[in-house]
């Protein structure tokens, strides 16, 4: 039997997304992490389009990290994402959608790495 209760992570995700959509008209940088992989994508919610994405599943990352999600893998994903965002042009400012994840560990490491590359989050 499926429970009607909403889990803590789902409540956190809804709360974060509601604040982002209410306060911003900027593009949204959304992340997803699992035990083995880390994914990031830049989304325009107005037209429902993904402009750029990167993950630890890409060959450049797998060759270096041996399929483990750690700070080194996240730094490489941030580098890939910054290269793709620079190709888009004037995409330097966006909102950071951390989803149900707390802003610690590799989530904060990824955000700080993007800030180091000159993006405003």
Curated annotation (Swiss-Prot):
GO terms for cellular component: cytosolic large ribosomal subunit. This is Large ribosomal subunit protein uL18. InterPro entries: Ribosomal_uL18_bac-type (IPR004389), Ribosomal_uL18_bac/euk (IPR005484). This is one of the proteins that bind and probably mediate the attachment of the 5S RNA into the large ribosomal subunit, where it forms part of the central protuberance. GO terms for molecular function: 5S rRNA binding; structural constituent of ribosome. Belongs to the universal ribosomal protein uL18 family. It comes from Ehrlichia canis (strain Jake). GO terms for biological process: translation. Part of the 50S ribosomal subunit; part of the 5S rRNA/L5/L18/L25 subcomplex. Contacts the 5S and 23S rRNAs. The keyword Iron-sulfur does not apply. HAMAP family: Ribosomal_uL18_B (MF_01337_B). The keyword Transferase does not apply.
